[in-house]
From Swiss-Prot:
It comes from the Bacteria. InterPro entries: TPR-like_helical_dom_sf. Gene3D superfamilies: Tetratricopeptide repeat domain. This is Uncharacterized 18.1 kDa protein in carS 3'region. It comes from Myxococcus xanthus. The lineage of its organism: Bacteria, Pseudomonadati, Myxococcota, Myxococcia, Myxococcales.
């Protein structure tokens, strides 16, 4: 049975991999080893793909490095369950390395949709947190900025209603 490392240990190992020298493929091998032990750690997968692409011209088989980078990016996108950052990295790869703008468009579209949903939730959470602290004026200032992007957001409306209720105003 394999043993899982703690999130802190995983981050420590990733920082150690980041500190390895690029020369001689040391960093690349450290990223690969970490990906082998934890294939769902997206920050490492993104670092691995960037390192593969940056060194592809010096690689013994440049196309193999590009193919590995693509596989790693697709894995990162898959295990992240639609998180924007890996989709964005995949989109950049597809449009610039693979010259596949149609497929890149789908990745960018998915990244943008995921980022917008996350951003809306962040604005609503910020307003809610300000309301919980009794800072109605600050919450309304944040609402004004949030409404420029999400004019009819139910989540933002609910957060503002909560903030108003906390301060006793309507």
């Amino acid at each position: 049975m394999s043993e899982h490392v703690s999130p802190q240990e995983l981050r420590r190992k990733w920082k150690l991999a980041n500190a390895e020298p690029l020369e001689g493929g040391h960093r690349l091998e450290a990223y690969r080893a970490l990906a082998q032990s934890c294939p769902a750690f997206v920050p490492n997968l993104l670092s691995l793909s960037r390192t593969l692409l940056a060194g592809r011209n010096e690689a013994a088989d440049p196309e193999a490095a590009v193919s590995e980078a693509e596989q790693v990016l697709r894995s990162a996108s898959d295990v992240s369950a639609g998180a924007p950052e890996p989709l964005l990295a995949l989109g950049h790869f597809l449009v610039s390395v693979r010259q596949a703008p149609d497929e890149a468009e789908r990745a960018f579209s998915s990244a943008a949709s995921a980022a917008m949903a996350l951003l809306e939730e962040a604005w609503a959470g910020w307003i809610h947190a300000l309301g919980a602290q009794g800072q109605l004026e600050a919450a309304l200032e944040v609402e004004e900025r949030a409404r420029s992007l999400f004019p009819s957001s139910k989540a933002i409306s609910q957060a503002v209603a909560f903030a108003r209720a906390q301060s006793g105003t309507r």
